C-alpha cells in the first residue's frame, strides 16, 4: 500500500513536471509566479491587492502546473515596505500546509504515520508487530483542533509579567513593531502572572459586531483590522481583538491541549478548540461548514488540526518552515478565477437594478456557474469591471455566486443603463443603487406581492405562482390576492382546483393580520417587522394613528431616528390609497393581543425551521407573545431546531438562562397555557 502511494505520487510529479516544461504552459507558469510574488509582498506589507481566496486560486493553479516551483515553498514576503520600526522574530513565524477536503486530511494523517514508521517511532497503526518502547500507534486518535482565524498574525512578548513588545508576522523573519497599537486592543492582558520572558503568538481580528458598530459600510473585517493595527495614530485599534494560539519558547508543555489551557489560565483569549480522533475532526469540520461558522462573531477560513503531542510534532519535524505535525483544514473555497463575457442588468423586486456578470462557466461547490452578482452600480465602478476581465467568482455560503474582485484588468469598465431593462422607465440614482420607480413595472409588482406573501407566512404560494398571477394580469397589488377565485388560479398553467383551494384558504387563515405584520407586508423601505413592532409598542396601535403621524413625532421614538422616520412617513403616504382599499375590503390590521396564552412572554427564532419564519411569528403574536430579533436578557424562549446546538445564539441563550425549545415545544406551550 505504501509503495503504491509513492508510485502514484511519482507518476503525478512526472506528469506535472512535463507540464512545467511544455512551452504552452511555461508562459502561464512564469506569469503566475510573478503575480504570486507581487500579491504576497502587498499582503505582508498590510495592503493586500487581492483576497485570500483569489491568492489561493492562483497558488492552486501554479501547483497544478508546477508543484515544485520555488515560489510555492516561500513564506511571507521579502519586500517589506513600512514606516514602522522593523523587529526580528527570535523564532521565525512560519506557515501551515493546507488541505481542503476530508480525503486530503486523511492523507495528511497517513503521511504523519508513514514518517513516524520510517524514522522508527511508530507502527503506523497496523499492529503488525509489537510496538517498540515509546512508539506511536497512529496520530489519528490524538488530534487537537482550533479555529483558523482570518486575521493578522502577531508575536506578543512579555517580560517580568508586563507587555513589552508586539511584532507583526511580516515576512516570517522580520516584522513591524506596533506595540502601542496592540496594547489598546481587546484580549491583550497588560500584565500576566508569569514573571519570566514569554513570547506568545496570536491573531488580530475585528469582530463582526465591532465592525458593524464602529466601521459602518466596511465589508472586510480582515482588511479593516490590518489598517487599524498599523495606523500611526492608533485610531480604531481599540476595536480590534487579539486571540492567542501558541507559546513560542522555553515552556515544557506536553500537548496542544495543555498549551491552550495554560494560555487561558494566564488571561489570554483563544479561539474555540476541541480534541479527538480524525473521525471527530471530520464531524466537527462538517458542523462548522454547515452551522457553527455562520454563528460566529468573527471570520474563520478553516480549522487548524494539530497532532496533540508536542513531542510527536517534534519527531515529525518541518519542511520549508511548515510543520508536518499541523495542517490548515481550510473550508473548501468555492471560488475560482474566470473571464467575464458579458454584463447584464436585471431589475429586482424592490426596483433595484442589479448588474450581473456572465462568465466563462466554472464549477463551484458542485454547481456550474455562468452568472455572478455584482451587487450594485457603485460596486461596478469600484471594481472597474468590464467584459474580458479576469475575475474571482465565489459562491457565498455555497449559494449565490458573486464576483469578489478583478484579478486581471483587460476590458473597458461597464457603463450602467439609464432606463429600466424591464419597463424602459428612466432610472434614478439613490446612493449605491440604480432604481426603477415605475409602480407599473412588472418586476416591482412581483416584488410587492412576494413581500406580502412572505410577511404573512403563506407557505403554499411559491415564486412560480406569483409570477403567473402577475403575468396574467390577475394581481397588481396585495388586495387583488383576496379577489382571486379557485377557477382563476386553477386555469393557470399546471394548476388544479385542489392546489388553488389550498392557496386561497391559506390567505384567509392568516386574517386578521397583526398590525406589525400588516405594516411589514406593505414592503415600505426601512419598515421591517422589528420597526413595526417598535411603533406598536410606542402606542401606535392602529393604522389610522400611523397615517396621521408626522416625521418629527416618529423621530422622537427611541431607536427610530429622523432618517427612518422620514422613510416611514413617505412610504405610508405613497401607499395610502392602496392601504385604504385594503381597509375598505375588510383587511383591517389589529394590534397584537395584550392577552393570550403567550402574553408577557418573548420569543426569538434561529436557524432553519419546518415552518416559515413569518408563520411562526404570526403564531406567537396572535397568541399574545412578542418576537425579538436577537438573544437578550429579556428573552424567555429561543426556538431552535436542535436544543443541543452550540451556535452562538444557543450559547448566549444558555448564558442568560433562556429556555431552548423546538417548534413542537412551542405548539405544546401554547396548548398548555390555553388549558388544552
From Swiss-Prot:
UniProt cross-references to Gene3D superfamilies, sorted A to Z: 5' to 3' exonuclease, C-terminal subdomain, BRCT domain, DNA ligase/mRNA capping enzyme, Helix hairpin bin, Nucleic acid-binding proteins
Active site: 148 (n6-amp-lysine intermediate)
Known catalytic reactions: NAD(+) + (deoxyribonucleotide)n-3'-hydroxyl + 5'-phospho-(deoxyribonucleotide)m = (deoxyribonucleotide)n+m + AMP + beta-nicotinamide D-nucleotide
Cofactor(s) this protein cannot do without: Mg(2+); Mn(2+)
Chain residues that bind Zn(2+): 420, 423, 436, 441
Keyword list, A-Z: DNA damage, DNA repair, DNA replication, Ligase, Magnesium, Manganese, Metal-binding, NAD, Zinc
Record: residues binding NAD(+): 52-56, 95-96, 169, 203, 330
First-tier enzyme category under EC: ligase
Annotated spans, Disordered: 1-23
Basic and acidic residues compositional bias, start-end: 1-10
A Gene Ontology molecular function term of the record: metal ion binding
EC number of the protein: 6.5.1.2
InterPro entries in the cross-refs: BRCT_dom (IPR001357), BRCT_dom_sf (IPR036420), DNA_ligase (IPR001679), DNAligase_adenylation (IPR013839), DNAligase_N (IPR013840), NA-bd_OB-fold (IPR012340), NAD_DNA_ligase_OB (IPR004150), RuvA_2-like (IPR010994)
Pfam families, per database record: BRCT, DNA_ligase_aden, DNA_ligase_OB, HHH_5
Domain BRCT: 593-676
Gene Ontology process terms (BP): DNA repair; DNA replication
Family stated for the protein in its record: Belongs to the NAD-dependent DNA ligase family. LigA subfamily.
Protein name, UniProt field: DNA ligase
Organism of this sequence: Sorangium cellulosum (strain So ce56) (Polyangium cellulosum (strain So ce56))
Upper lineage: Bacteria, Pseudomonadati, Myxococcota, Polyangia, Polyangiales
Amino acid at each position: 500500500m505504501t509503495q503504491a502511494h509513492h508510485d502514484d505520487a511519482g507518476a503525478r510529479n512526472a506528469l506535472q513536471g512535463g507540464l512545467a516544461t511544455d512551452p504552452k504552459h511555461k508562459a502561464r507558469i512564469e506569469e503566475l509566479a510573478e503575480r504570486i510574488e507581487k500579491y504576497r509582498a502587498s499582503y505582508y506589507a498590510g495592503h493586500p491587492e487581492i483576497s485570500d481566496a483569489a491568492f489561493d486560486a492562483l497558488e492552486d493553479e501554479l501547483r497544478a502546473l508546477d508543484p515544485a516551483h520555488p515560489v510555492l515553498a516561500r513564506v511571507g514576503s521579502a519586500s517589506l515596505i513600512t514606516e514602522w520600526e522593523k523587529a526580528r522574530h527570535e523564532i521565525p513565524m512560519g506557515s501551515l500546509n493546507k488541505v481542503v477536503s476530508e480525503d486530503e486530511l486523511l492523507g495528511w494523517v497517513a503521511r504523519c504515520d508513514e514518517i513516524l514508521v520510517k524514522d522508527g517511532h511508530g507502527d503506523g497503526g497496523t499492529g503488525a508487530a509489537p510496538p517498540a518502547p515509546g512508539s506511536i500507534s497512529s496520530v489519528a486518535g490524538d488530534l487537537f483542533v482550533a479555529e483558523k482565524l482570518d486575521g493578522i498574525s502577531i508575536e506578543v512578548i512579555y517580560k517580568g509579567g508586563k507587555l513589552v513588545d508586539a511584532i507583526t508576522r511580516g515576512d516570517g523573519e522580520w516584522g513591524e513593531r506596533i506595540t502601542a497599537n496592540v496594547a489598546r486592543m481587546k484580549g491583550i492582558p497588560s500584565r500576566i502572572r508569569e514573571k519570566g520572558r514569554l513570547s506568545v503568538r496570536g491573531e488580530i481580528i475585528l469582530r463582526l459586531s465591532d465592525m458593524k458598530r464602529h466601521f459602518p459600510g466596511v465589508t472586510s473585517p480582515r482588511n479593516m483590522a490590518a489598517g487599524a493595527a498599523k495606523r500611526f495614530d492608533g485610531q480604531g485599534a481599540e476595536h480590534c481583538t487579539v486571540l492567542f494560539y501558541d507559546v513560542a519558547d522555553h515552556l515544557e508543555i506536553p500537548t496542544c491541549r495543555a498549551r491552550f489551557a495554560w494560555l487561558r489560565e494566564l488571561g489570554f483569549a483563544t479561539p474555540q478548540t476541541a480534541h479527538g480522533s480524525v473521525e471527530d475532526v471530520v464531524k466537527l469540520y462538517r458542523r462548522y461548514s454547515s452551522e457553527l461558522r455562520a454563528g460566529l462573531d468573527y471570520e474563520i477560513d478553516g480549522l487548524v488540526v494539530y497532532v496533540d503531542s508536542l513531542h510527536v510534532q517534534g519527531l515529525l519535524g518541518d519542511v520549508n518552515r511548515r510543520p508536518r505535525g499541523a495542517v490548515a483544514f481550510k473550508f473548501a473555497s468555492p471560488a475560482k478565477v474566470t473571464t467575464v463575457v458579458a454584463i447584464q442588468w436585471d431589475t429586482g423586486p424592490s426596483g433595484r437594478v442589479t448588474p450581473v456578470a456572465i462568465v466563462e462557466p466554472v464549477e463551484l461547490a458542485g454547481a456550474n456557474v455562468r452568472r455572478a452578482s455584482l451587487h450594485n452600480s457603485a460596486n461596478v465602478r469600484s471594481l472597474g469591471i468590464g467584459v474580458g476581465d479576469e475575475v474571482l467568482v465565489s459562491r457565498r455560503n455555497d449559494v449565490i455566486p458573486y464576483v469578489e474582485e478583478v484579478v486581471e484588468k483587460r476590458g473597458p469598465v461597464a457603463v450602467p443603463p439609464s432606463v429600466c431593462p424591464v419597463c424602459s422607465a428612466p432610472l434614478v440614482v439613490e446612493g449605491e443603487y440604480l432604481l426603477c420607480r415605475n409602480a407599473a413595472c412588472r418586476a416591482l409588482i412581483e416584488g410587492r406581492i412576494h413581500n406580502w406573501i412572505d410577511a404573512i407566512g403563506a407557505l403554499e404560494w411559491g415564486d412560480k405562482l406569483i409570477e403567473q398571477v402577475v403575468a396574467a394580469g390577475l394581481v397588481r397589488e396585495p388586495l387583488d390576492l383576496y379577489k382571486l377565485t379557485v377557477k382563476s388560479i386553477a386555469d393557470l398553467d399546471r394548476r388544479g382546483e385542489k392546489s388553488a383551494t389550498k392557496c386561497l384558504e391559506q390567505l384567509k387563515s392568516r386574517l386578521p393580520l397583526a398590525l406589525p405584520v400588516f405594516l411589514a407586508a406593505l414592503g415600505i423601505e426601512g419598515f421591517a417587522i422589528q420597526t413595526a413592532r417598535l411603533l406598536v409598542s410606542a402606542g401606535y396601535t392602529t393604522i389610522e394613528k400611523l397615517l396621521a403621524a408626522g416625521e418629527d413625532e416618529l423621530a422622537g421614538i427611541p431607536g427610530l431616528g429622523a432618517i427612518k422616520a422620514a422613510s416611514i412617513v413617505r412610504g405610508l403616504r405613497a401607499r395610502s390609497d392602496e392601504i385604504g382599499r385594503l381597509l375598505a375590503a375588510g383587511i383591517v390590521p389589529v394590534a397584537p393581543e395584550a392577552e393570550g396564552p403567550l402574553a408577557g412572554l418573548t420569543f426569538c427564532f434561529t436557524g432553519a425551521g419546518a415552518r416559515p419564519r413569518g408563520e411562526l411569528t404570526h403564531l406567537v403574536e396572535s397568541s399574545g407573545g412578542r418576537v425579538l430579533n436577537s438573544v437578550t436578557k429579556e428573552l424567555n424562549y429561543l426556538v431552535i431546531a436542535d436544543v443541543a446546538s452550540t451556535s452562538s445564539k444557543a450559547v448566549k441563550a444558555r448564558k442568560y438562562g433562556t429556555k431552548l425549545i423546538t417548534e413542537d415545544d412551542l405548539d405544546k406551550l401554547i396548548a398548555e397555557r390555553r388549558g388544552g
